[in-house]
Design a protein with these regions (language model features):
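A short alpha-helical cap/connector motif
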Residues: 1-151
Length: 151
């Protein structure tokens, strides 16, 4: 299933163009999800390149991580591509539900989503120490409760 961010969207095309640009060498994406959205936009631009580059994509939901690994099984062995299960912040850094916009139309879903994030964070390790210190390009798309702290 194609992701919300894909090559048919302006953001997806911008990600593809940035990934195709050999001026940038190191990429980090937080929020792989199923690997078929922004991850695909990045890899569509990166995989044809014949220069040195590295791509790290993190997912904290084990189920979606497994979907991404299955989708990208043909490139999983590429040492430039690092699809990782983990997180870079801790549970206590997730934003409190009450600090999100009151008018958000999906607010009623927040308690469920927050609990899912907490459950996932208890299952996966903080792997920030395994990542390079600097990246040329970073996309933060981890979620409602984590993205500000990840920034």
């Amino acid at each position: 299933m194609s992701g919300q961010i894909n090559r048919r969207t302006a953001l997806g095309e911008a990600i593809f163009n940035i990934a195709s640009n050999t001026s940038y060498k190191s990429y980090l994406e937080i929020g792989t999800w199923n690997g078929q959205g922004s991850t695909k936009c990045f890899l569509d631009g990166l995989l044809p390149r014949d220069d040195e580059w590295s791509f790290y994509s993190l997912e904290s939901d084990p189920s979606f991580y497994n979907q991404s690994i299955n989708f990208w099984s043909d490139v999983e062995k590429n040492p430039k591509v690092n699809l990782l299960l983990g997180r870079i912040i801790d549970e206590d850094e997730l934003i409190d539900i009450n600090n999100l916009k009151k008018q958000d139309p999906v607010k009623k879903e927040y308690p469920i989503w927050k609990q899912n994030d907490l459950n996932n964070y208890q299952q996966v390790e903080n792997i920030a120490h395994l990542l390079p210190e600097f990246f040329d390009v970073i996309l933060l798309d981890g979620g409602e409760f984590s993205t500000l702290a990840e920034f």
